């Protein structure tokens, strides 16, 4: 891991530029994705079948995954995995149900009524990667908040495979997916955004994917809503001398194994801990099955910063605004209020980040690349709309006429003013 020195502002700028470099867009990819989107818009199902044969090497006779195939997955899944998914589902549901919020209504003055309605999005599409990147936990994290929000129809797409990963189909059934289609890549995102003869057009698309999927989501944004454009996974760990280097090293590697572009950042006020963590990382890498991914990730993108004190550690990490933030300090909860920017926080020596990935209930779809400065984890709020309503009586309009027309004339919008004036007592 590379060590950085300097002021917090200087270090945070270096880290941000490095992260942008890891997340930068590929213009060749964008050109390819634009072509795919246009083809799907023009040819619909025919284009989906052609791209499935080209990219996935699968000849599709049927795009829809039947209920029979889904139900058979329950016979094939490992029973311990099924139990774990059921328990994780319960935790995710109990957490996200607390995010439900109702509308409001008030009467600030005589004859004036104001309010806000909360309405679920009608139809949502969830993208689920296939192959070695098949993550049933992501199915739960994307679908359950939508279901709790009251989304009427949830469509899931996943790349076609000769044999589906049973846990993916089981997770979809447990979470409440209504229909599953075997289509992936940029072509799948295009199908969700514009609809085809078989796939219905959705109102919002969520879910992780490779650079082609992420680019497609970016290009269809505006036609549909999206959750976010996520960059490589990242973890920031604030640790002092009370931290266990074995735990810290394991947690840094838990993100490094995701992707060669993943980031792992340790900020500590203990040089001894920093040294011990580096030694422990090398030791743990020796037996890690995904060493081929984790080693280049940690060597190229891993960073250690020695801070002067606890205050400086939190100041720097707030500038970094990591996706995942672990606070490996005794009585970590006492430091919670010091955090201004983070996607999700993990408190104390025993709260490893994977607890949040799989089980605790808080969502694992999180803002990356310092976007936690202005955005949040996926939740129920992402699947609802807020609709305002207003009602004024004739007397209330007359009482407010002067202020409203004054503002309208000040902006040079005479028709706005007249729309109020025609309703006054003189008319």
From Swiss-Prot:
Binding site residues for Zn(2+): 255, 258, 357, 416
Documented EC number(s): 1.1.1.23
Residues binding substrate, per UniProt: 233, 255, 258, 324, 357, 411, 416
Coiled-coil residue windows: none
CDD domains reported in the protein's UniProt record: Histidinol_dh
CC annotations in GO: cytosol
Listed GO biological process terms: L-histidine biosynthetic process
Pfam families the UniProt entry points to: Histidinol_dh (PF00815)
GO molecular function: histidinol dehydrogenase activity; NAD binding; zinc ion binding
Sequence positions that bind NAD(+): 127, 187, 210
Catalytic residues identified in the record: 323-324
Pathway info: Amino-acid biosynthesis; L-histidine biosynthesis; L-histidine from 5-phospho-alpha-D-ribose 1-diphosphate: step 9/9
Cofactor note: Binds 1 zinc ion per subunit.
Keywords noted in UniProt: Amino-acid biosynthesis, Histidine biosynthesis, Metal-binding, NAD, Oxidoreductase, Zinc
HAMAP family per record: HisD (MF_01024)
Family: Belongs to the histidinol dehydrogenase family.
Database matches in NCBIfam families: hisD
Name of the molecule in the record: Histidinol dehydrogenase
Native organism: Streptococcus mutans serotype c (strain ATCC 700610 / UA159)
């Amino acid at each position: 891991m590379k060590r950085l020195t300097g002021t917090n502002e200087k270090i945070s700028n270096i880290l941000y530029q490095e992260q942008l470099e890891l997340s930068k867009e590929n213009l060749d990819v964008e050109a390819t994705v634009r072509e795919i989107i246009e083809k799907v818009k023009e040819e619909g199902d025919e284009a989906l079948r052609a791209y499935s044969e080209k990219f996935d090497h699968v000849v599709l006779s049927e795009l829809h995954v039947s209920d029979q195939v889904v139900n058979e997955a329950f016979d094939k899944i490992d029973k311990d995995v099924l139990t774990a998914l059921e328990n994780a589902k319960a935790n995710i549901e109990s957490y996200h149900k607390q995010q439900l919020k109702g509308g409001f209504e008030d009467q600030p003055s005589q004859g004036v009524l104001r309010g806000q309605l909360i309405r679920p999005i009608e139809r949502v599409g969830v993208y689920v990667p296939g192959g070695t990147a098949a993550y049933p936990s992501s199915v739960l994290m994307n679908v359950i908040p939508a279901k709790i929000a009251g989304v009427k129809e949830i469509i899931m797409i996943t790349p076609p495979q000769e044999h589906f990963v049973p846990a993916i189909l089981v997770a979809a059934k447990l979470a409440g997916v209504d229909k599953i289609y075997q289509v992936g890549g940029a072509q799948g995102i295009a199908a969700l955004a514009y609809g085809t003869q078989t796939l219905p057009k959705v109102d919002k698309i969520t879910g992780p994917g490779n650079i082609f999927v992420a680019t497609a989501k970016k290009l269809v944004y505006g036609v549909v809503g999206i959750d976010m454009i996520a960059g490589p996974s990242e973890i920031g760990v604030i640790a002092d001398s009370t931290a266990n280097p074995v735990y810290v090293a394991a947690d840094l590697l838990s993100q490094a194994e995701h992707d060669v572009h993943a980031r792992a950042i340790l900020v500590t006020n203990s040089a001894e801990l920093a040294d011990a963590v580096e030694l422990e990382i090398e030791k743990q890498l020796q037996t890690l099955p995904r060493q081929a991914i984790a080693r280049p990730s940690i060597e190229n993108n891993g960073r250690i910063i020695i801070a002067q004190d606890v205050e400086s550690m939190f100041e720097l990490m707030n500038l970094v605004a990591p996706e995942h933030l672990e606070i490996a300090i005794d009585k970590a909860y006492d430091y919670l209020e010091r955090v201004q920017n983070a996607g999700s926080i993990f408190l104390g020596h025993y709260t490893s980040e994977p607890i949040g990935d799989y089980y605790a209930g808080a969502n694992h779809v999180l803002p990356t690349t310092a976007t936690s400065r202005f955005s949040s984890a996926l939740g129920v709020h992402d699947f609802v709309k807020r609709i305002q309503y207003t009602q004024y009586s004739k007397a209330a309009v007359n009482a407010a006429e002067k202020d409203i027309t004054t503002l309208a004339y000040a902006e040079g919008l005479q028709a706005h003013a007249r729309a109020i004036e025609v309703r006054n007592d003189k008319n």
